[in-house]
Amino acid sequence: MAETSLPELGGEDKATPCPSILELEELLRAGKSSCSRVDEVWPNLFIGDAATANNRFELWKLGITHVLNAAHKGLYCQGGPDFYGSSVSYLGVPAHDLPDFDISAYFSSAADFIHRALNTPGAKVLVHCVVGVSRSATLVLAYLMLHQRLSLRQAVITVRQHRWVFPNRGFLHQLCRLDQQLRGAGQS
């Protein structure tokens, strides 16, 4: 993925309200209907599963230099600073894939980690959870909103062009709140 171009979105502006959860779920059902263990969803930014994250040789082949584990200390996620050693920068987010889990508490720190990494020449970032569909996707969507200034709708469409993702409804509500906060801040 050399260049990323945003899809035509019909002149969406700051006044456009956040899509409803049902509209977001429809957007999530559209686009790519399958995913690999790991997919590049933005230049040098990958979403993947725990099996990929647990395979240091695969990470080396992909050129991954930074790992954000959205299921830190989870059952299937053995990664951590000791696992990767000094060759990979690591951030662990102990998120649970439950609608009532407050993943928004990690939006800023996760987005900042991704942003700093992608501003490092030659860096590639893997964001993963167990399956690479809900927690990791939520944090990548938050990054695209916070640092790439995409609306939630634009971020979902962009990621869905490259990977099947489906954050749980609680995470979608939290992303909607972030979208509304960012749009409100942009109107001041």
From Swiss-Prot:
Q: How is its activity regulated?
A: Inhibited by vanadate.
Q: Could you tell me which PROSITE patterns the record lists for this protein?
A: TYR_PHOSPHATASE_1, TYR_PHOSPHATASE_2, TYR_PHOSPHATASE_DUAL
Q: Which reaction does it catalyse?
A: O-phospho-L-tyrosyl-[protein] + H2O = L-tyrosyl-[protein] + phosphate; O-phospho-L-seryl-[protein] + H2O = L-seryl-[protein] + phosphate; O-phospho-L-threonyl-[protein] + H2O = L-threonyl-[protein] + phosphate
* Domain Tyrosine-protein phosphatase positions: 37-184
Identify the tissues in which this protein is expressed: Skeletal muscle specific.
Q: Where is the active site?
A: 129
Q: Which UniProt keywords apply?
A: Cytoplasm, Hydrolase, Protein phosphatase
What GO biological process, any one, is recorded here? dephosphorylation
Where does it live in the cell?
Cytoplasm
The EC number of this protein is 3.1.3.16, 3.1.3.48
Q: Which family does it belong to?
A: Belongs to the protein-tyrosine phosphatase family. Non-receptor class dual specificity subfamily.
Put simply, this protein is called Dual specificity protein phosphatase 13A
